[in-house]
Design a protein with these regions (language model features):
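A broad structural signal for short, well-ordered beta-strand segments within beta-sheet-rich domains
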Residues: 1, 13-14, 53, 129
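Asparagine-centered strand-capping/turn motif at beta-strand->loop junctions
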Residues: 2-9
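Short, hydrophobic/aromatic beta-strand segments
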Residues: 10-18
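Short capping micro-motif at the N-terminus of alpha-helices
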Residues: 14, 26-27, 68
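Surface loops and adjacent helix of pleckstrin homology
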Residues: 17, 29, 132
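Solvent-exposed serine/threonine-rich low-complexity stretches and specific carbohydrate-binding patches
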Residues: 25-34
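Intrinsically disordered, metal-sensing/regulatory segments
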Residues: 33-43, 47-330
C-alpha cells in the first residue's frame, strides 16, 4: 500500500503501475483524478518481500512517469497499544532520561562563582547554537524532499521567523526572562528540537531500518546529556521546587515521544520541515535571551563574549555537540 500525492500544477490520473519493471493491477482510494496537493492510497497486490528493495513507477494518462525507490519493503504501520507503549519508552529514553541526568548536576553546580556561571551560561549558548544550525539544516533538507507546492525552503524561513518573533514578544512581557522563566524557554527550545529527533527515529523504524533506528537512539541519547546542564544553569542561584525540575525535564524531553509516534505513523517531509522550523525559531529566541542575560550579568555589553570563561564555554558547548553528533550522522 502506497500513499501518493499530486504535486503538479494540473490534476492527474494514475493509469498504470509498474513494480520492478512489471505492470500490476491496482486499486485507488478514492478513485478518479488526483487534484493538485491531494493524496490517494494505491493498493497493489504484488508479492512484496519483507526487507527487500523495490522500484515503483506510476504512469499517468498523459504518459508521464514517476519512479520511486522503496529501499525496504515493510507492512503499512498500524496503531496498536503495544506499539505506542514501546515507542513511548524509546522516546523517554532518548529525550527525558538524558535531560534528567544533566539536571542531577544541579546540587554540584550551585557552588560555582561568577566565572563558573559565565562558563555554564556560555556552554548553554554553545549547545543551543549547534542545535539551531542542526535544526535549520535538517528542516531545509526535508523541505527539499517535499512537494513543490509547499514551497519548502520559503515555508521553513517564514515559520522559523514567525516562531522567533512570537516567542520574543511573549518572553519580553514583564521584562526579560531570568531564573526559572529563562530555564523554561531553554527547555521549550530543546523540546522542539527533540521533537525532530523523535521524528527521525520513528521514521527509521517505520521504514524497517531497525539498525539505523537503534543507532539513532544511542547517538541522540549521548547527544542530549549536556542539555540538562544548560537548562539548570539559569536557576543555580535559585531554589526551585522539585516539581519545577520535573516539568522542565518533561518539557525538554517529552516531545521526543510525540515525535516517535508521528514519525512512525504519519511522517511526511513537509510536516517534518514545519516542526523543525518551529524548533529553529524557538532555539534562536533562547540564544538571544540567554546572550542578553549574560551581557546584563557582566555589564560589559558585547565585550562580555571576549572573556576567557565565556569563550571557553562557547567552545566547549559547540565542540561537545559536534563530537557527539558524529554518532548520529549516516
Amino acid at each position: 500500500r502506497m500513499l501518493v500525492r499530486a504535486g503538479g500544477s494540473d490534476p492527474m490520473r494514475v493509469a498504470q503501475v509498474q513494480v520492478d519493471a512489471a505492470y500490476w493491477s491496482f486499486t485507488q482510494t478514492p478513485p478518479g483524478d488526483i487534484s493538485r496537493g491531494a493524496t490517494v492510497w494505491l493498493d497493489v497486490p504484488y508479492p512484496w518481500v519483507l526487507g527487500e528493495a523495490h522500484a515503483v513507477t506510476l504512469v499517468t494518462t498523459t504518459g508521464a512517469t514517476f519512479t520511486h525507490e522503496i529501499e525496504v519493503a515493510v507492512p503499512t504501520p498500524k496503531v496498536t497499544a503495544g506499539q505506542l507503549r514501546f515507542q513511548a519508552l524509546i522516546g523517554i529514553f532518548v529525550g527525558v532520561v538524558p535531560i534528567v541526568f544533566g539536571l542531577m548536576f544541579y546540587p554540584v553546580l550551585r557552588g560555582v562563582g561568577q566565572g563558573g556561571m559565565n562558563f555554564l551560561m556560555a556552554l548553554t549558548i554553545g549547545l543551543l547554537s549547534f542545535l539551531l544550525v542542526d535544526s535549520a539544516e535538517e528542516a531545509l533538507e526535508l523541505a527539499g524532499n517535499s512537494a513543490a507546492l509547499f514551497q519548502g525552503p520559503v515555508m521553513v524561513i517564514l515559520v522559523a521567523a514567525a516562531t522567533f518573533l512570537l516567542l520574543m514578544a511573549v518572553g519580553q512581557r514583564g521584562g526579560p526572562p531570568t531564573g526559572l522563566a529563562l530555564s523554561t524557554f531553554i527547555a521549550l527550545g530543546i523540546g522542539l528540537h527533540n521533537l525532530g529527533e523523535g521524528l527521525a527515529i520513528g521514521a527509521a523504524f517505520a521504514a524497517g531500518s531497525a539498525g539505523l533506528g537503534t543507532f539513532l537512539v544511542l547517538g541522540f541519547t549521548l547527544h542530549n546529556i549536556t542539555e540538562g546542564i544548560g537548562i539548570a544553569a539559569p536557576v543555580l542561584k535559585k531554589r526551585p521546587p522539585l516539581w519545577a525540575f520535573a516539568g522542565l525535564a518533561l518539557l525538554a524531553g517529552g516531545p521526543a515521544v510525540i515525535g516517535m509516534w508521528l514519525g512512525s505513523l504519519a511522517f511526511s517531509p513537509q510536516w517534518g520541515a514545519f516542526a523543525l522550523a518551529i524548533g529553529a525559531g524557538a532555539i534562536l529566541q533562547v540564544v538571544v535571551q540567554v546572550g542578553a542575560y549574560v551581557m546584563r550579568s557582566n555589564r560589559l555589553g558585547l565585550e562580555t563574549f571576549l572573556r576567557p570563561s565565556i569563550l571557553g564555554g562557547l567552545t566547549a558547548g559547540v565542540a561537545f555537540m559536534y563530537i557527539t553528533a558524529a554518532f548520529v550522522k549516516v
